[in-house]
């Protein structure tokens, strides 16, 4: 039914242009629609009236290429310093429900190896229902994403 299809479809909206390059996309996920009894929908992210949306689905190639870009940026910002710890928040639906165990372990490995190599760096991971990550120099609410916060010693 239309209602069932809406419950597994991602809605994306256009991201403000100043974030396109840093984010690696001109669109940002607004989430799965919550279908109300009257068949109207509710989205998690606050959206301005009249905003246009597109329907989207997972694109594994884009997920991995985006992850590689994110890890390259993080490693560059570490500037050779070894992380003291990493806090990792992952979307519960995207990471725990949508992906199979093998793919999820591959994604986590793609994140851990560039930062930790084979060293015993503490890595605290959790699933969430919305993730905060930096975008444009400020905390930004994301949905269906991964957020990594790397703790480093200050440069002397």
Question: For each predicted feature, which ranges?
Answer:
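Small-residue-enriched flexible segments
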Residues: 1-121, 126-156
